Structure formats: structure tokens, C-alpha cells
């Protein structure tokens, strides 16, 4: 459903794909969030939810990291969930063998491409890294699995070298090539340029984007890459991940589906449910103002806004909350107006006589000025008091 009426920019994006694969890496890159470590049971719970959600790929983990990680990845692979199950591996036979032993459908092979990583982390020349990348892809492909390749820190690599590496691994048999913005330094304009530059090297294979959020641009960069022709996005639920996190699954999917009319295969009505599950398991709360899944996203307090939303929700909401599994909330406070109170009273089954509405509104504003939040229970208390006082006044008038 395209919800931007009157805007046809998407139709002018000649490289915009009609469908995009959602590659979820919550269980791998998301688990690299400082302080987060999933048990096998927790990984299985999240994997089942991701399958229910409808992602194309689930990166279940990095089998070479530990025996527990290996067992968790293997358990997920044996669940028969539906999505492609992927394991991460460095560009060496040991890691690839471990991934193969985990019975996964695909192996995500990576090696550094930027000079800073090659010099200070791997202590390796460009030529050596290129040779290892090609050998690793050939080795993995020889075992009959799907292979995705990532030139780590690709957005800081020399462009010509990056092009050469992508072309070489594609010639070696890579099925997909992912471009990682490892430290989140891209901007949407630069990401579009980079993806357009790399596409010829991929020779028709799927190009993917993997964006980190160090400057708050992970989602924007992911969308920009897709607008330029990338056909897959790496994401995590709630945007969890190391440092500032990754591109948030719920935000990328919603933007693609509702702003660009690009199909993702994801059941958007399960986005909120999925977000809550991951938040509960990780212990990381969802910020109230987080796009798509935050509590405030479909909440309204301002009298002008509430009046508009009651008459037509699209006055102050870009999509219906039910489209992402959310619900609308009318919040009462000092910014509230008569229509908001009337709506709240009607929702709770109370009379909406003008005198009751105005007296409740006065009390709501008084409490708001004191910094007191009017919860549903507090509102009931206020209404009951107003109704009680009205009855006493009636009795006094007739006595």
C-alpha cells in the first residue's frame, strides 16, 4: 500500500526493485550488542518469530565462535522454519567447515576490504585479502550451499579495490554480495552513488546493504541503497547491535512497503509483536518515540491533533496503527481539548454530557500543570468524582 498520495517519486527511480529480500541478523549482529548474549532457547524463540514474520533470511549466528553458538545455529537450521538459515564465517576453511557442520542453507563469508582493517587488524595486503576471499567463496560453493560475501568496512575501502573484490567473488560463485557500512559513515547520497558504482561488478547477482547507525542514518542509508538498485537489506529487530546498532527491521520494512510500494514478504501486522518479544528477551526497552513500534507513535494529546484524528486518523497519522500491529492512544494532559476528553469518556463507557466533559477537562489540565500524568485509572477516578458531585448537586437542588 503506497500511502504518499500525490507523490510519484518512486516511479522515477529506475533502479528501484519491486521486491526486496529482508535478511535479518538479530541473532548474529544484534547479539553483538554490549551485554547481550542469547541462550539457545532464546535464539529459537526469536527465530520462530522471525519465520512467522516472513523474513527471507535468518542469520542464526557465527558457529566458529563457541560450541554453544554452533549448537544454537544447528538447532535453528534443523527446525525447518521456512526462511533461509545463514551462518557467518570468516574467509577460512575452519570457519566454513564449522558453518557447514551446522547444516545451514547459506554461508555469509566476510573479509576486510578497507586499508585500515587490512593494516591494523589483519596485517594483510590487498592482494592477499583478495586471494583469500576468492578461495573462501570457491570452497563454500563447492559444498553446494548458497554463498553471500561481505567486504567488511566496504564503505571505507578504495572504490576500485572494492569493485575488483566484488567482481572477483562473483566470478568465484558468490550468489549475493553485501556492502557493509561497518562504522556507519555513509550518507544517503553517498550510498546511492556507491551502490550504482558496484552494481556492474555484481553482474546481475543480488547486491545487499548492511548499515550501522553511528550517525543515525542506518535506515535512511538502507533505503537509499535500495533506491539505487540493492535488492536486499540486512536488518535487526529494534535496530539492536554493537555501538549505535543496525538498521531497524520494522523501520526499513515499513518505509519500503508504505512509502515506496516495494514488497518485502513481511507481515507488517506482526512488527509490533516481534519488537516486544525481542525487547523482553534482551531487556532493552523500546523508546516511546521509536518509529513504528514506540508507544507514542500513535498517541495523541494536543487538542487540535486529537480533534483531527477523531474525524480522520490520516490528519496526523501516516498509516493506520493496525497495519503494524499497534493501536491508537488518546492521551490526556494539559494540552488536551474537549474532543479528547469526550473521546476518552466514550471509550470508557461514561456519559459525555457537556458539563461532565468540561469539568473533567478542567481537572485534567490542572493535574497536567502539576506534572501529573493522567492514566486510565486516574481518569476513572476523576470521572467518578465529577459524577458523584453532580448527583449530590441534583439531590441538594430537589431537597
Swiss-Prot record:
GO terms for biological process: L-leucine biosynthetic process. PROSITE patterns: AIPM_HOMOCIT_SYNTH_1, AIPM_HOMOCIT_SYNTH_2, PYR_CT. It holds the Pfam family HMGL-like. InterPro entries: 2-IPM_HCS-like, AIPM/Hcit_synth_CS, Aldolase_TIM, IPMS, LEU1_arch, LeuA/HCS_post-cat, PYR_CT. A divalent metal cation binds at residues 29, 210, 212, 246. Keywords: Amino-acid biosynthesis, Branched-chain amino acid biosynthesis, Leucine biosynthesis, Metal-binding, Transferase. Pathway: Amino-acid biosynthesis; L-leucine biosynthesis; L-leucine from 3-methyl-2-oxobutanoate: step 1/4. Residues 20-272 form the Pyruvate carboxyltransferase domain. Signal peptide: none annotated. This is Probable 2-isopropylmalate synthase.
